[in-house]
């Protein structure tokens, strides 16, 4: 978790078993499905990003393999340019289709994923 900063104050976050905390005490809980929501609590309530139906539709479409050639090429390019044991961030990862592909192709790398949609992160965390 030392790759991320607190979204409230900008201090480094420390990962704990049940979430993350910064030195100023701002804490972020880990969801049952394994992701940590780093959005500040003062945002308007509601579903940010893609909703459950949108995420499921994209997941189902991608699982049919239509974008597999693109994902495979992305993995080859990352392998060519990323150092061994690299830390790779997938910002705006959606439901994790490319994240999972890169993680499977480069098992020695640390893959981090971010998305504003809680529904997408629930699938990515699996």
Where are these regions (language model features)?
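N-terminal auxiliary segments of SAM/dcSAM-dependent transferases
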Residues: 1-48
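Class I SAM-dependent methyltransferase Rossmann-like catalytic core
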Residues: 52-70
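Conserved alpha-helix/loop element of class I SAM-dependent methyltransferases that forms part
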Residues: 65-84
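Conserved class I S-adenosyl-L-methionine
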Residues: 85-94
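Conserved SAM-binding loop of SAM-dependent methyltransferases across substrates and taxa
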Residues: 95-107
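Short beta-strand element of Class I
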Residues: 109-112
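Conserved SAM/SAH-binding beta-strand->alpha-helix loop
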Residues: 115-119
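Conserved SAM-binding loop
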Residues: 124
């Amino acid at each position: 978790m030392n790759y991320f900063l607190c979204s409230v104050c900008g201090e480094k976050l420390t990962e704990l078993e049940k979430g993350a905390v910064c030195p100023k005490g701002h804490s972020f809980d880990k969801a049952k499905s394994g992701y940590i929501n780093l959005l500040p609590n003062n945002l308007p309530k509601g579903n940010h990003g893609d909703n459950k139906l949108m995420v499921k539709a994209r997941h189902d479409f991608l699982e049919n393999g239509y974008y597999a050639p693109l994902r495979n090429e992305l993995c080859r390019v990352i392998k060519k340019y990323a150092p061994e044991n690299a830390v790779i961030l997938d910002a705006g990862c959606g439901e994790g289709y490319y994240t999972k592909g890169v993680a499977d192709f480069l098992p020695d790398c640390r893959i981090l994923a971010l998305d504003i949609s809680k529904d997408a992160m629930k699938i990515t965390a699996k």
